[in-house]
Amino acid sequence: MASISGTMISTSFLPRKPAVTSLKAISNVGEALFGLKSGRNGRITCMASYKVKLITPEGPIEFECPDDVYILDQAEEEGHDLPYSCRAGSCSSCAGKVTAGSVDQSDGNFLDEDQEAAGFVLTCVAYPKGDVTIETHKEEELTA
């Protein structure tokens, strides 16, 4: 009900447009515009995406990497070749060194605390936690 100068007017006769009650109907739009993922049950999850800059011997490369994708996997998806062997964080083939930003590499078990504190990272088990710059091809420096 609405009131105009003390008179009550009913708005029930006005047509109503149907409202979207869930993002399930527009799941692709949600992901494209807002970085939202929608499962079959309509549950929405938010994912962040960060700028990753890799300094390789061939020159720097940059790409966007979601916070739930390993840096090595996203680099390969973008068409970049990086060294790797085990893809499980159990060797040093994919070693790099973080020069700016930070990563989550809690899935790996090869690096000790001192190596992680020195900035070493295994790109096969590293998720970006924000924009990050990594020097790649650091296996020799790590094992020296």
Swiss-Prot record:
BP term (GO), one: ferredoxin metabolic process
Chain sites annotated for binding [2Fe-2S] cluster: 86, 91, 94, 124
Highest taxon in the source lineage: Eukaryota
Transit peptide: 1-47
Requisite cofactors: [2Fe-2S] cluster
An annotated GO cellular component: chloroplast stroma
Domain 2Fe-2S ferredoxin-type intervals: 50-140
Entry note: cofactor: Binds 1 [2Fe-2S] cluster.
PANTHER family (alphabetical): FERREDOXIN, FERREDOXIN-2, CHLOROPLASTIC
Family designation: Belongs to the 2Fe2S plant-type ferredoxin family.
NCBIfam families the record matches: fdx_plant
Listed name of the protein: Ferredoxin-1, chloroplastic
